């Protein structure tokens, strides 16, 4: 989501790679940082979530990747479907294509799991 142009570049120059997305539909890797900054600035840390969620609509990362010339699958919400998707993706990488598998994971803190 940060740079869709990087997806295009990999497709244009035929860079075979596999990206498996840990998609919690949020920028939660930045959550604690936002709280620290809010506290340092004396602002309300309960508002730190603003701009962190990627919901309504949920981005179609597989669709974005396909639009840039990638083979892509997802969003995958059932953990039982991941293994087969990875096999298909690996076959594409072996053919010299970039592949993306979007796995939707549980939101929030704690052990990461598919929903």
Where are the predicted features?
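Thiamine diphosphate
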Residues: 1-115
């Amino acid at each position: 989501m940060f740079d869709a142009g990087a997806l295009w570049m990999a497709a244009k120059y035929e860079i075979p790679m596999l990206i498996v997305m840990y998609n919690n539909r949020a920028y939660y890797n930045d959550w604690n940082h936002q709280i620290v900054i809010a506290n340092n600035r004396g602002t309300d840390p309960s508002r730190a979530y603003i701009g962190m969620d990627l919901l309504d609509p949920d981005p179609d990362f597989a669709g974005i990747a396909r639009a840039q010339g990638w083979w892509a699958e997802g969003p995958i919400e059932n953990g039982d479907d991941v293994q087969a998707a990875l096999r298909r993706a690996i076959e594409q990488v072996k053919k010299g294509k970039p592949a993306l598998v979007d796995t939707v994971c549980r939101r929030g803190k704690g052990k990461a799991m598919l929903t």
